[in-house]
Amino acid sequence: MARNLDPKCRQCRREGEKLFLKGEKCFTDKCAIERRAYAPGQHGQRSGQRLSGYGVQLREKQKIRRLYGVLERQFRKVYAEADRRRGQTGENLLQLLEGRLDSVAYRMGFGASRAEARQVVRHNGVLVNGKRVNIPSYTVRPGDVIELAEGTKGHLRVKAALEAAESRGFPEWIEVDAKAGKGVFKAYPQRSELSATINEGLVVELYSR
């Protein structure tokens, strides 16, 4: 299966902001953005080049892809579905990305990062409505119950991720019983509940060209 093998800290530096790809490290002063807040590469510190309108749109799309750990082909499929749905395409896009099983598992604290949560899903560590689902892109629907498989609940990394997520607080659109390793996806998130640093409108403009 294709994967993005670029170092995670390098990806954050490329986008110029934290994408929270390395779990707890992103919340400490060891985060690469805290230490080297400039683009990677030989000329990163001197990079003052202005992007064209297309370049800005492309950069935003790449940022969202990296944030959610989605490859180009997958992203295009999600965008096409968002465009078919009623409502604003950009908001639909973010809701669909948040509704992926790997994203929901991450939000519920089943992994310290989306990549870690994705691995838990792939290794048959997550149940949806009582049935094992090992497809990270599986679409979770409002009302679905997501829980850790019994054999996964005791994993130290999973327990640590759950504790950290509980201490930070869970998003409003999910309800989690951290002790039971179980939660409910109550609804798709509203735009106001998601990161203000994302400009999904630029992606809509890019695909409308």
Swiss-Prot record:
GO biological process, one term: ribosomal small subunit biogenesis
HAMAP family attached to this UniProt entry: Ribosomal_uS4_B
Gene: rpsD
SMART domains xref list: Ribosomal_S4, S4
GO cellular component, one term: small ribosomal subunit
Family: Belongs to the universal ribosomal protein uS4 family.
GO MF, one annotated term: rRNA binding
Domain S4 RNA-binding: 99-179
Listed Pfam families: Ribosomal_S4, S4
InterPro entries registered for this protein in UniProt: Ribosomal_uS4, Ribosomal_uS4_bac-type, Ribosomal_uS4_N, S4_RNA-bd, S4_RNA-bd_sf
Keyword terms: Ribonucleoprotein, Ribosomal protein, RNA-binding, rRNA-binding
SUPFAM superfamilies: Alpha-L RNA-binding motif (SSF55174)
Organism this protein belongs to: Azoarcus sp. (strain BH72)
The protein's name in its UniProt record: Small ribosomal subunit protein uS4
Keyword Ribosomal protein attached: yes
Function: One of the primary rRNA binding proteins, it binds directly to 16S rRNA where it nucleates assembly of the body of the 30S subunit.
Oligomer status and interactors: Part of the 30S ribosomal subunit. Contacts protein S5. The interaction surface between S4 and S5 is involved in control of translational fidelity.
Keyword Ribosomal protein: yes
